[in-house]
């Protein structure tokens, strides 16, 4: 079949020209900022006055005075605008979609999700990086939805979004606004609860942004507990070692029982629950809304389980003693409360070895200090000769390096030198 050139031309996807970026023009910016009347002027006595001045726009961007721009939409962005977020559009198509649907940075849907949140939750391997850069502003960065999540936390939903996370964290530093530090802390919690093995480099970015490594969520869980209890991660040795080197609290107690399946409490589950909750049902003409999560039980708040309890539970299915031994390397000294004889013997041996080393150094510490001082300060020692030689070199004296070698080895003449060479 012969296809006309006109039809072929209509299917051709235009290339993105960096010098003429369709996402960087003034029309797109005005729509995103909800500045629909920016170019409208009023005339009074022959003088034109702009309705929306450039100064007013700058003021709103800096100080967050954007209440008149906020719009709540009575539908779900994840469903209505999924074509925008799923990574299937190139830049020109994104620009056209924003124009046609009047997408703004101040919109949120019926469960308080913003377009920035949706772009982050759909992104895989930074597929929505350009869209995130386009959508972010002070309002939708700090905005929380009905599940108490932010756009930054949703960037951890799928793997590989390290550039998006880095960009969002840099946005905090580069822009003129303050945020609740718990936005960063909560994101570190979500990092530790993903279905895929968490990326250490992402955690480093959050810690650099002053995320607390010992932060607890509302259930009393920490990033260390989440990682230990997640059976999606088979080998967590490197993750645990990283947290230990960063100073995670290994003596922390928690209300979370090791027998609980923490993996069932995925942080992304709440999104689906809210989506279902937003759907109305009618029974006998009466509207019924499906119930959301059960409230967290506040009656049992006293911590009674140690991190070691969780490690022992994990050992029952992965047989990894190395993580347990690392805890003792970083200062843990208590024996675990378990009936597992293999673990008891293993940890007793570690504790006994540590106590022996510590007792040895306590006993011989004075002698070791004396030997150290002798090596450093005793006249005639190698170190003292090096210090002496360094002093003479820096003082400008004429030196004969061979003389120091001969003196040190007791070589007084040529015969003794030849004898030593022959012996070697």
UniProtKB/Swiss-Prot annotation:
Any keyword Repeat?
yes
Presence of the UniProt keyword Ligase in the record = no
What keywords does the record list, in alphabetical order?
A: ANK repeat, Repeat
| InterPro entries xrefs | Ankyrin_rpt, Ankyrin_rpt-contain_sf
Q: Give the disulfide map.
A: none
Q: Which residues form a coiled coil?
A: none
Q: What PROSITE patterns has UniProt attached to this entry? A: ANK_REP_REGION (PS50297)
Q: Which Gene3D superfamilies would you find in this protein's record?
A: Ankyrin repeat-containing domain
Domain of life, per lineage: Viruses
The major lineage groups are: Viruses, Varidnaviria, Bamfordvirae, Nucleocytoviricota, Megaviricetes
ANK repeat copies, ranges? 115-144, 147-177, 184-215, 219-252
Q: What is this protein called?
A: Putative ankyrin repeat protein R858
